[in-house]
């Protein structure tokens, strides 16, 4: 065997000599990489043969077998890469000669030859290379118009409002556009946002550190000198720790190769010792990391300051794997076992006040050390603890659920439900289910979860002062899940141990009635005891609401039925000494918003129709029924000939108003409109509030649906409606704006603006005097806007009943061909801008300067949400140039306002372009004096422009303006000092 290998090796060497050692040995007769790898994996190549091959290739032959193999494999792969590069170049030259020799075809077909290209990418390149299609598609992108990146910078709105915010920042950094990150505050927001520990985030931070450091290769004219990570190492360590960002801290330390002593010093100076003591899951991760690189000062030892936030670290809503990690991080971070051993050696443990906790904890740690995470299935690790302990996926208990005793062990129980049962044992396969617990290899999962919780609680009891033990009371859920007592006994413990607070009452009843699997008879007994005043000394009247809510929200028909029957019996036997309970009809109506399935509605309809208000004629209760059940509710109510009452002034949940209003319009035979006593003036105010609440949920189609099927008697005042949508935190309402201005031309707007009343004697001119009425014409497409109300989609046309034309006060039911709306000039221009109709704006500027640049209107256009305030740098510069070209006593104010906005937003390039123009810079950015009357602005006005850039922390722009504008030395020094104080 070895002799054969030698022959193959000799052949390799000869081949290498002939080919300048550039071959990878793939040809016939050679020891090829493929054959070499196959022989090794099959076990036919022994250690001695590997050494011979390595020596023949000039490689080291010492070390373990796998190490020698890796060297040889690396040799083959490096040869292959080199040959591929050489061969590719040779092949390209050969192909080029062939192409020159052959006649060129008239039309060349491009074919992708890569084998690993995704199918979608192939389509992309086909489109990319088709000039006609490419231009059509990319003409829809309005990056110059919006340019939200330079408009808002890297603040919390960008970070939290855009799912691709990291990619946006990366693109801007790579293109050396540092407008996206203007100051250290932006970077702190980034550190607070991007914490995921994956390759993408790690690469992002490495890019960030490389560009914002003293060694950066970024052009000096672009890099903001105020941001350099390596200039304040200790401060950035502090910020990353306090923002609990493990990924940023880890990459920061590695990138700048920070010594552990430097980290210790930074922590000692800038981090309070109690910071890590107030333990959270992520803080433990950072603490253990710093401990692993020997960077925790002795003053910050965790054990001496530790306290635990039970509500987050040990929540039963956490995944099982998080509980395991929390336990390990807590035990590892404190060196608990080492400290225990030291105490034991010193004999201190014998007199330790918490000795009993130490012994129990030590036993639990030994038991948990025997358990490996690999023993659990992925399903178990990624399930919540509550879900695993409840045996079933949290859901409402159905009427067919068996009332046999529920089990807390892994023994499978037979129920008549089809609910998904989780595996409660550790098993050797990946199955999520188990039907037996007799196998010795199976371990009860509930007991393991309990051990983890128990160990953490014992750890706390062992490490804290005995006087503070009452602070670390085990949470109520731990008691409910792990104590094997009857429900009535559990409730007594709630009263005694947890003082029976409202929160504990609510938690107890919700878990007992809805989540925890307990024998149904015990739940019945608890209901009976509460209603029979067994707990009268502890159960207060204010707790009744909590109790009723828990019963009705369970959506368990058996439970609700039993509750209502006992309550009815109590009311029949009621005496002055007993608790007075609400009548059944009121209770059902008050808690009907908890109904989440049709069966509950049917139950009330069949058994309590006459007692409750739910199905009465012209009732208001229907508004509380969940939208997903409203169609079934309508069917039940209509089946007995009753109608629902729609009273706009008694509506309490405006976020659901439009969906319900559209239903009433669609089914006027089932709903009765009660708009009596209202006046038309109030409708705009009411409708604005309803629109505001619906824009947050992006329900613009609901708004359009209503306006398409209700003939308004008076123009709709849209300015305040759209005003609220211009807030950066809200939806832009582009769909609604397109709907309004769909068929309104610039000529029709011009006509309306011409007749506007420009005369006013009011010095404090109000915007209400600058409004116009426009008419929207609805097309067939518009009037059939789809809306989703009950889970099924239908068009507005199909939803309408045959009964149309009903006058309901504010409007007349029925499809409308057009409607009028009132809009202010300021909002009009903003809407045109949003619709990318800037050419129309310029058209109106040219046609109606006396209207749009009227001095009385100037205050309107200094607001934040005006045309110039929302413009991107591209369009703001366009407006600035327009005012320069059309300069007069009116436009000069608008020009100055735009320059102030550009300064505040840090649009540095606008000012660079002005400076580069000798003509513009002389009268825009030079001080107007007696000797220089060609300049437009005084020293104070130009000073204010600079101050706005300083206040916005745009120091690059500030320095640019200070250096160029001819301020006095005193004014320059004052401005520079202001920059220093702002840093």
Swiss-Prot record:
Q: Keyword Protease, does the record have it?
A: no
Renumbered to this chain, region (Disordered) spans 1-26, 391-413
Which stretches does UniProt call biased (Low complexity)? 392-413
Q: Which GO terms describe its molecular function?
A: DNA binding
InterPro entries listed in its UniProt record: SAP_dom, UPF0746_actin_org
Q: Which UniProt keywords apply?
A: DNA-binding
Per UniProt, the ranges with Basic and acidic residues bias are 1-21
Ranges where the SAP domain occurs = 42-76
- Is DNA-binding given among the entry's keywords? yes
Q: Which family does it belong to?
A: Belongs to the UPF0746 family.
Protein name stated in the entry:
UPF0746 protein DDB_G0280809
| Naturally occurring in which organism (per UniProt) | Dictyostelium discoideum (Social amoeba)
The taxonomy runs: Eukaryota, Amoebozoa, Evosea, Eumycetozoa, Dictyostelia
């Amino acid at each position: 065997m070895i002799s054969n290998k030698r022959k193959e090796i000799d052949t390799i060497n000869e081949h290498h000599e002939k080919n300048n050692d550039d071959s990878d040995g793939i040809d016939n007769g050679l020891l090829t990489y493929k054959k070499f790898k196959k022989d090794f994996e099959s076990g036919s190549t022994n250690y001695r043969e590997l050494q011979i091959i390595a020596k023949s290739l000039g490689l080291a032959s010492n070390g373990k077998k796998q190490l020698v193999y890796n060297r040889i494999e690396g040799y083959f792969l490096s040869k292959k890469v080199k040959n591929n590069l050489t061969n590719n170049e040779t092949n390209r030259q050969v192909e080029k000669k062939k192409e020159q020799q052959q006649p060129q075809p008239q039309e060349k077909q491009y074919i992708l030859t890569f084998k690993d290209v995704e199918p979608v990418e192939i389509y992309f390149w086909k489109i990319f290379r088709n000039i006609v299609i490419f231009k059509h598609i990319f003409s829809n992108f309005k990056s110059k118009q919006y340019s939200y990146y330079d408009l808002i910078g890297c603040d919390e709105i960008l970070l939290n409002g855009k799912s691709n915010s990291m990619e946006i920042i990366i693109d801007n950094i790579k293109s050396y556009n540092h407008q996206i990150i203007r100051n250290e505050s932006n970077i702190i927001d980034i550190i607070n946002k991007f914490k995921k520990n994956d390759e993408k985030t790690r690469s992002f931070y490495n890019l960030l550190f490389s560009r914002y450091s003293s060694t950066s290769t970024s052009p000096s004219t672009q890099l903001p000198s105020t941001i350099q990570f390596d200039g304040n190492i200790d401060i950035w360590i502090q910020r990353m720790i306090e923002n609990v960002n493990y990924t940023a801290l880890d990459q920061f330390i590695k990138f700048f190769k920070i010594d552990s002593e430097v980290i210790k010093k930074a922590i000692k100076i800038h981090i309070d010792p109690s910071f890590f003591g107030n333990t959270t899951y992520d803080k433990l991760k950072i603490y253990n990391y710093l401990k692993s690189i020997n960077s925790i000062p002795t003053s910050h030892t965790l054990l001496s300051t530790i306290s635990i936030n039970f509500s987050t670290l040990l929540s039963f809503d956490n995944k099982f794997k998080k509980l395991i990690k929390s336990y390990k991080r807590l035990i590892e971070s404190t060196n608990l076992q080492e400290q225990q051993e030291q105490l034991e050696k010193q004999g201190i443990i014998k007199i330790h006040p918490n000795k009993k906790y130490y012994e129990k904890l030590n036993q639990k740690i030994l038991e948990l050390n025997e358990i490996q995470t690999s023993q659990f299935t992925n399903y178990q690790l990624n399930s919540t603890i509550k879900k695993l302990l409840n045996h079933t996926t949290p859901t409402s208990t159905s009427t067919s659920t068996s009332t046999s005793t529920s089990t807390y062990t892994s023994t499978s129980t037979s129920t008549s439900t089809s609910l998904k049962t989780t595996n409660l044992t550790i098993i050797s396969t990946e199955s999520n289910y188990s039907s037996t617990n007799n196998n010795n290899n199976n371990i009860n999962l509930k007991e393991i979860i309990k051990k983890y919780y128990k160990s953490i609680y014992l750890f706390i009891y062992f490490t804290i002062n005995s006087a503070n033990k009452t602070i670390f009371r085990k949470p109520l859920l731990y008691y409910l899940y792990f104590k094997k007592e009857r429900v009535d006994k559990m409730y007594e413990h709630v009263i005694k141990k947890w003082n029976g607070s409202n929160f504990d009452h609510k938690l107890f009843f919700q878990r007992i009635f809805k989540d925890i699997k307990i024998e149904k008879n015990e739940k019945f007994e608890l209901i009976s005891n509460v209603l029979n005043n067994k707990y009268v000394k502890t159960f207060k009247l204010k707790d009744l609401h909590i109790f009723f809510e828990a019963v009705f929200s369970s959506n368990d028909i058996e439970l609700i039925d039993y509750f209502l029957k006992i309550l009815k019996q109590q009311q029949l036997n009621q005496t002055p000494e007993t608790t007075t309970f609400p009548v059944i009809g009121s209770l059902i109506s008050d808690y009907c918003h908890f109904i989440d399935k049709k069966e509950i509605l049917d139950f009330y309809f069949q058994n309590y129709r006459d007692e409750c208000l739910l199905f009465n004629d012209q009732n208001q209760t229907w508004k509380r029924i969940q939208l997903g059940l409203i169609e079934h509710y309508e069917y039940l109510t209509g089946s007995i000939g009753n109608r629902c009452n729609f009273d706009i002034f008694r509506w309490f949940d405006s976020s659901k108003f439009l969906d319900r209003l559209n239903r009433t319009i669609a089914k006027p035979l089932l709903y009765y409109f009660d708009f009596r006593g209202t006046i038309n003036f109030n409708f705009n105010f009411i409708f604005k509030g309803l629109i505001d609440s619906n824009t947050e949920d992006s329900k613009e189609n609901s708004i359009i649906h209503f306006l398409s099927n209700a003939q308004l008697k008076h123009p709709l005042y849209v300015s305040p409606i759209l005003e609220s949508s211009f807030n950066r935190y809200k939806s832009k309402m582009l769909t609604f704006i397109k709907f309004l201005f769909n068929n309104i031309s610039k000529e029709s707007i011009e006509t309306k603006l011409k007749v506007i009343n420009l005369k006013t004697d009011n010095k404090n001119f109000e915007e209400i005097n600058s409004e116009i009425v426009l008419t929207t014409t609805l097309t067939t497409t518009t009037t059939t806007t789809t809306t989703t109300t009950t889970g099924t989609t239908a068009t507005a046309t199909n939803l309408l009943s045959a009964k149309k034309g009903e006058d309901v006060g504010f409007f007349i039911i029925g499809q409308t061909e057009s409607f009028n709306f009132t809009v202010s000039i300021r909002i009009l221009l903003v809407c045109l801008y949003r619709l990318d109709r800037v050419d129309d704006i310029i058209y109106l500027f040219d046609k109606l300067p006396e209207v749009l640049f009227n001095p009385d209107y100037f205050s309107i256009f200094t607001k934040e949400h005006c045309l110039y305030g929302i413009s991107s740098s591209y369009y703001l510069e366009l407006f600035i140039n327009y005012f320069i070209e059309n300069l007069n006593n009116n436009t000069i104010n608008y020009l100055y306002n735009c320059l102030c906005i550009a300064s505040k937003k840090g649009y540095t390039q606008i000012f660079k372009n002005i400076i580069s123009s000798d003509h513009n810079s002389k009268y825009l950015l030079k001080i107007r004096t007696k000797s220089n009357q060609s300049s437009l602005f005084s020293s104070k006005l130009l000073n204010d422009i600079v101050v706005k850039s300083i206040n916005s922390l745009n120091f690059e722009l500030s320095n640019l303006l200070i250096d160029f504008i001819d301020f006095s030395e005193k004014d320059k020094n004052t401005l520079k000092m202001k920059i220093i104080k702002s840093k």
